[in-house]
Swiss-Prot record:
SMART domains hit by this protein: 7TM_GPCR_Srsx
Protein name (record): Melanocyte-stimulating hormone receptor
Membrane-traversing stretches: 38-63, 73-93, 119-140, 164-183, 192-211, 241-266, 280-300
Mode of membrane association: Multi-pass membrane protein
Organism in which the protein naturally occurs: Bos taurus
Family listed: Belongs to the G-protein coupled receptor 1 family.
Length: 317
């Protein structure tokens, strides 16, 4: 990915120089005990990508099979699974092609590899943007279902959900094309960082508000049953733990990648930033880990979806 890492992995496999260079030069890699570089083996990249691929394919298949899951909420979850699937496919494809090039099994011209690298970059960038947007859409959908329960089906209709889904995919494609075309502009990187911060803030505000409402509801039930402390405290701890896991996974998996983008703009030549640039592959691996965890958080917790998933695994179509 041209502006994201300190190297283009596919082009680096051919030992050729990219045709375009950044207007800001990244700091040279710094060595020494204070500069930690975490090496990610290609086998681990492939393994994580394949696990994520299988998980998200199962989610899409289960939602497609069960008509009871054909609702806006599950359509958003399905689109999130497709986005995570594309993240995995693009990284697996890039790693596989890179290994074939390095082994001399695949022989092709540098121009062809450059075009392939651009296609993979479009997939990676587009799937990342769509994944962030669908995480935000799921948060908004759940917020409406709690705070506007009686009006939910009139607010979140299927036609409206389809329009939102179409808008997210179109915006993701356009964003990825703009990124590939203008990757040497700092504004593009700042826009991607801004999207991450906006989604993080949106999810934090909505889920914290939902947790507060749930705790308030639990207190009301506890008063009626005259067992206020045990019920309220247990529910509050469980809700806080769920919220911590949800937002914590999002921040830990996506945060380092967007920190990397921010530092490319803020301190591209600083030695300390150069240490962080060396761990770009680690940041990509964390995003793939997020694609593995997303189905566990958003999809597999549904009893209906788990039941359908068992039928899919048993091939009972």
């Amino acid at each position: 990915m041209p502006a994201l890492g300190s190297q283009r992995r596919l082009l680096g496999s051919l030992n050729c120089t990219p045709p375009a260079t950044l207007p800001f030069t990244l700091a040279p890699n710094r060595t020494g005990p204070q500069c930690l570089e975490v090496s990610i083996p290609d086998g681990l990249f492939l393994s994580l990508g394949l696990v994520s691929l299988v998980e998200n394919v199962l989610v899409v298949a289960a939602i497609a099979k069960n008509r009871n899951l054909h609702s806006p909420m599950y359509y958003f979850i399905c689109c999130l699974a497709v986005s995570d699937l594309l993240v995995s496919v693009s990284n697996v494809l890039e790693t596989a092609v890179m290994l074939l090039l390095e082994a001399g099994v695949l022989a092709t011209q540098a121009a062809v590899v450059q075009q392939l690298d651009n296609v993979i970059d479009v997939l990676i960038c587009g799937s990342m943007v769509s994944s962030l947007c669908f995480l935000g859409a799921i948060a908004v959908d759940r917020y409406i279902s709690i705070f506007y329960a009686l009006r939910y089906h009139s607010v979140v209709t299927l036609p409206r959900a389809w329009r939102i889904i179409a808008a997210i995919w179109v915006a993701s494609i356009l964003t990825s094309l703009l990124f590939i075309t203008y990757y040497n502009h700092k504004v593009i990187l700042l826009c991607l960082v801004g999207l991450f911060i906006a989604m993080l803030a949106l999810m934090a505000v909505l889920y914290v508000h939902m947790l507060a409402r749930a705790c308030q509801h639990a207190r009301g039930i506890a008063r009626l049953q005259k067992r206020q402390r045990p019920i309220h405290q247990g529910f509050g701890l469980k809700g806080a733990a769920t919220l911590t896991i949800l937002l914590g996974v999002f921040f830990l998996c996506w945060g380092p990648f967007f920190l990397h983008l921010s530092l490319i703009v803020l301190c591209p030549q600083h030695p300390t930033c150069g240490c962080i640039f060396k761990n770009f592959n680690l940041f990509l691996a964390l995003i793939i880990c997020n694609a593995i965890v997303d189905p566990l958080i958003y999809a597999f917790r549904s009893q209906e979806l788990r039941k359908t998933l068992q039928e899919v695994l048993q091939c009972s179509w």
